[in-house]
Amino acid sequence: WCWGVKPQTKAQLAEPVNALERDEDPLGTWRNYVNKQLADSYQALFEQMSFWVMLKAPSFDQVYNWRKEQEHKLAAKLGSSEAHSGIMTDLEIERFIQHYQRLTEQSLETLPQQCNYVYHLDETRQITHVEKAV
């Protein structure tokens, strides 16, 4: 979820992007830590990539919808036995995905500029068009 994501500016980090950041990281400790890792430790890894391809979702909201769809399909496949109690409810999915909202939105905004190919997806995961680096 963070591969290739550019670090954000201090101004971008100042404001929480969702309820989880607002309520559980009001001082920005976690988001600043993650940002520092992106700026420092991850850069050497990112530099090893010689070719970048992105499957670009239409939005973070759509990523959330896809995650719910995935969980619902898993629940339908496994049934309702207690052995499968790890299946998340919609509220649990909403909380879970908030951990990745900042990185996802940042990647949707900045990652296409560094990719060799960007495959734009619609809500049904169909490729609508392909961007090739100039």
Please annotate each region the language model reported.
Residues 2-134:
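Conserved NTP phosphate-binding and transfer environment spanning the P-loop NTPase/kinase superfamily
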